């Protein structure tokens, strides 16, 4: 009987240790209405510009891969090595963006070459993405509206958001790319 109690306690201890290890290993940012900007976070216009520029670069650099996948892999290292501060300062949405991209190099860090540059073809910028048609029933729409109006969702954001991840917490280029 003593051996079964010891084995049960050992099993419980191992199970608890594994659960704690998994919990610590997952980084989940939570934000409340009292959250403040992280010292190294991007907020407001800088966050919007960095997001727009990164998504623009990823869609046009990898048109066959990026629009179909939300997950990211190692093929995007060149774009991911561009610092967020550079992405926040670029304005790729100007009317003369084609001339800007074809004449200027966007600086990025390469492991082999150090600071370098990349040119992107302007023909890829002409492609338009088609939005999928939304098919919703009335009950689904009511459920969405009910969730949007709930006080609980305002107080603690249950799902991660761009502002929570990149303004109230420190953000990486990889994290920002998951919102493209």
Swiss-Prot record:
Residues 71-152 form a propeptide. GO terms for cellular component: extracellular region; transport vesicle. InterPro entries: Insulin-like (IPR016179), Insulin-like_sf (IPR036438), Insulin-rel_pep (IPR016724), Insulin_CS (IPR022353). It holds the Pfam family Insulin. Residues 1-25 form the signal peptide. Disulfide bonds join 43-167, 55-180, 166-171. It is found in: Cytoplasmic vesicle, Secretory vesicle. The modification Pyrrolidone carboxylic acid is found at residue 26. Transmembrane segments: none annotated. PROSITE patterns: INSULIN. This is Molluscan insulin-related peptide 7. It comes from Lymnaea stagnalis. The lineage of its organism: Eukaryota, Metazoa, Spiralia, Lophotrochozoa, Mollusca.
């Amino acid at each position: 009987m003593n051996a079964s109690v010891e084995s049960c306690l050992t099993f419980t201890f191992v199970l608890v240790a594994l659960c704690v290890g998994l919990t610590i290993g997952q980084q989940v940012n939570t934000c409340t209405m009292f959250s403040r900007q992280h010292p190294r976070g991007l907020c407001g216009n800088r966050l919007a510009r960095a997001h727009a520029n990164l998504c623009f670069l990823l869609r046009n650099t990898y048109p066959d891969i990026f629009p179909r996948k939300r997950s990211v892999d190692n093929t995007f290292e060149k774009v991911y090595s561009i610092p967020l501060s550079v992405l926040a300062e670029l304005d790729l949405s100007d009317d003369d963006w084609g001339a800007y991209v074809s004449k200027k190099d966007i600086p990025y860090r390469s492991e082999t070459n150090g600071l370098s540059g990349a040119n992107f073809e302007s023909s890829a910028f002409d492609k338009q993405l088609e939005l999928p048609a939304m098919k919703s029933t009335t009950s689904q729409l009511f459920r969405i509206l009910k969730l949007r109006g709930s006080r609980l969702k305002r107080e603690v954001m249950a799902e991660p958001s761009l502002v929570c991840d990149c303004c109230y917490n420190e953000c990486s280029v990889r994290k920002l790319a998951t919102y493209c």
